[in-house]
């Protein structure tokens, strides 16, 4: 496929995803998605994020009759003991989420979907993350900063939350919300130029 497109639609208001796209030189127009993000009964975390990423991309496509540029959508969730942790709805919930991961490994799943006139491609990035053992005081102090409020799993690895993480196995950008390797590959597949890269 000829690589000649230079812009995409981004189906997200996430400043982290915008920052990561800027990092790899991809220009975009934001067109937020609006879909039901409820978890299905007994749905696996991987299936959940793949479904939402695909749904977000296709929802935006439905509002773009011309579909003159590809649509990129993504969804991230944190999973511990098989339980999906979304964005906390309160400081109390954020504290409980962080306590459940304290001193333990958890998984961060980020799915991306790129929709174009040729259809929709999806990819999944899974990263294992080891959180340090956290005291109640440390958890309370972190939550009081407000950083956890709009983050799946109640922490942001790219901010103060990074001080709570001992190690990761996988994609740092995936934990931030947009795995760059998979994103670049899918965008190139549908004709988007990524500066300094090739197939």
From Swiss-Prot:
The record marks 16, 76, 158 as: Important for substrate specificity. Its main location: cytoplasm. Keywords: Cytoplasm, Hydrolase, Nucleotide metabolism. It is found in: Cytoplasm. Its EC number is 3.6.1.9. The active site is at 75 (proton acceptor). One of its GO terms (molecular function) is dTTP diphosphatase activity. It is an enzyme of class 3 (hydrolase). Nucleoside triphosphate pyrophosphatase that hydrolyzes dTTP and UTP. May have a dual role in cell division arrest and in preventing the incorporation of modified nucleotides into cellular nucleic acids. Belongs to the Maf family. YhdE subfamily. This is dTTP/UTP pyrophosphatase. It comes from Methylobacillus flagellatus (strain ATCC 51484 / DSM 6875 / VKM B-1610 / KT).
């Amino acid at each position: 496929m000829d690589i000649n497109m230079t812009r995409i639609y981004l189906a997200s208001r996430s400043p982290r995803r915008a920052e990561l796209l800027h990092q790899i030189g991809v220009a975009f127009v934001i067109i937020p998605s609006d879909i039901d993000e409820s978890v299905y009964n007994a749905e696996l975390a991987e299936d959940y994020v793949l479904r939402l990423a695909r749904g977000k991309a296709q929802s935006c496509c439905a509002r773009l009759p011309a579909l003159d540029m590809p649509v990129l959508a993504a969804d991230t969730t944190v999973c511990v003991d098989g339980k999906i942790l979304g964005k906390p709805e309160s400081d109390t919930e954020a504290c409980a989420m962080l306590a459940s991961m304290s001193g333990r490994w958890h998984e961060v799943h980020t799915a991306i979907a790129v929709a174009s006139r040729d259809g929709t491609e999806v990819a999944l990035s899974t990263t294992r993350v080891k959180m340090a053992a956290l005291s109640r005081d440390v958890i309370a102090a972190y939550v009081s900063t407000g950083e956890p409020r709009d983050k799946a799993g109640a922490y942001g690895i790219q901010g103060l939350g990074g001080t709570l993480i001992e190690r990761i196995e996988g994609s740092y950008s995936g934990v931030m919300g947009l795995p760059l390797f998979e994103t670049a590959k899918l965008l190139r597949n549908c004709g988007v130029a990524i500066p300094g890269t090739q197939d």
